[in-house]
Amino acid sequence: RQRQMCIRDRIKSVYESDGYVMDTHTAVASAVYEKYKAETGDTTKTLIASTASPYKFARSVMSAIDSKYENGEDFALIDELCRISGVKIPAAVEEIRSAAVLHNTVVDRDEMKQTVLEFLGL
C-alpha cells in the first residue's frame, strides 16, 4: 500500500509541477530515481525513458492526479486524460469503444483453472 501511494504521489507531483501525465511504470522508475538521488547525493543527469502509455492505466493515473476520478467510467476517464494531457487517444484505445464484447464470463478465483480448461476444450 505504501508503494502504491509513492507511485500515486509521483504521478500527481509530476503532473502538478510539469503538466506531464506519466504512466504507472514510468512513475515507478521516477520514484526510484528520486529515492536514489536523495540517498546518494548523485547529481548526474539522468534520462528516464517512458515505455508505457498512461491510457493503458487511465484509472490509476487519473485517480493519482485527483481522487475525484476514482469512480469514473472508463471511457470518461480516457476522454479526461486526453483533455488534461493534450495527447491524442491511441487508435487501439479508441477502437475498443465500439468493439463487441467477445467474452463476458466472470468466475471466482477457485474456478479459474477449470474455466480455462473448458475454454481450451481440455
Task: Annotate each PLM feature.
Residues 2-7:
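Short, small-residue-biased leader/transition segments that mark boundaries at the very start
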Residues 10, 25, 57, 74-77, ...:
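Alpha-helical structural motif
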Residues 10, 14, 60, 64, ...:
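Residues that form generic nucleotide/phosphate-binding pockets
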Residues 11-29, 35:
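Generic long, charged, amphipathic alpha-helical segments
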Residues 19-22, 47-51, 102, 106:
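Hydrophobic alpha-helical scaffolding
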Residues 24-28, 52, 56, 107-111:
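Conserved active-site and cofactor/substrate-binding residues in soluble primary-metabolism enzymes
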Residues 31-98:
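Catalytic phosphate/nucleotide-handling subdomain of diverse soluble enzymes
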Residues 91-122:
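Structural signal for terminal/edge beta-strands and the immediately following C-terminal loop/tail
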